[in-house]
C-alpha cells in the first residue's frame, strides 16, 4: 500500500514490536496502515485511538455496519483500492451472520445505486458524504440543515 519506508513485523523491535503484537489480527498479521506508521509508533497509537473512537464508541447512534458502509462509499469515491478492501471486509464483519445482506449493500455502493438498499436518513447522509468527498466547497449551511430534518 505505502511508498514510504516502513518496518515489517519481522524486523520490528522495542515499542513498535509491542504495538504490532497488541494490534495484530487473529491470524497474526497486521494491517498495512500500521506498517505505514512504523517509523513513528506513537502515531500508530493515535491512529488506533481515533479509529476506535469514531467507529467503536458506545455513544455512536449509527450502526457499525452503516459507518463501515460510509467508509466504503468514501473509499469508492476516492478510488482507493486498499481502503475499499478494508471497509468491505470490515463491513462484512459488522454485518455478521448476514453475508448476502452486506454483499447487496457493497454492490449497491460500488455501482452507485444507493437507492437499491438505502432510503430516508441513510440515503440522505450518503448524499452528503458524496458531496463532502467530491466537492466540499459546494456545501452550505443548508446542506447540514437538510440532514437535521
Regions found by a protein language model. Name each.
Residues 1-149:
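Hydrophobic alpha-helical segments
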Amino acid at each position: 500500500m505505502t511508498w514510504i519506508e516502513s518496518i515489517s513485523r519481522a524486523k520490528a523491535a522495542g515499542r513498535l514490536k509491542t504495538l504490532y503484537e497488541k494490534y495484530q489480527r487473529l491470524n497474526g498479521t497486521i494491517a498495512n496502515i500500521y506498517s505505514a506508521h512504523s517509523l513513528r509508533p506513537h502515531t500508530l497509537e493515535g491512529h488506533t485511538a481515533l479509529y476506535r473512537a469514531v467507529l467503536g464508541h458506545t455513544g455512536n447512534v449509527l450502526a457499525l455496519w452503516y459507518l463501515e458502509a460510509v467508509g466504503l462509499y468514501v473509499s469508492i469515491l476516492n478510488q482507493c483500492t486498499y481502503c475499499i478492501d478494508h471497509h468491505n471486509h470490515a463491513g462484512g464483519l459488522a454485518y455478521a451472520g448476514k453475508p448476502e445482506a452486506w454483499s447487496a449493500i457493497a454492490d449497491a455502493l460500488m455501482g452507485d445505486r444507493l437507492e437499491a438498499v438505502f432510503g430516508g436518513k441513510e440515503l440522505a447522509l450518503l448524499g452528503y458524504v458524496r458531496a463532502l468527498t467530491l466537492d466540499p466547497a459546494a456545501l452550505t449551511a443548508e446542506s447540514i440543515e437538510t440532514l437535521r430534518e
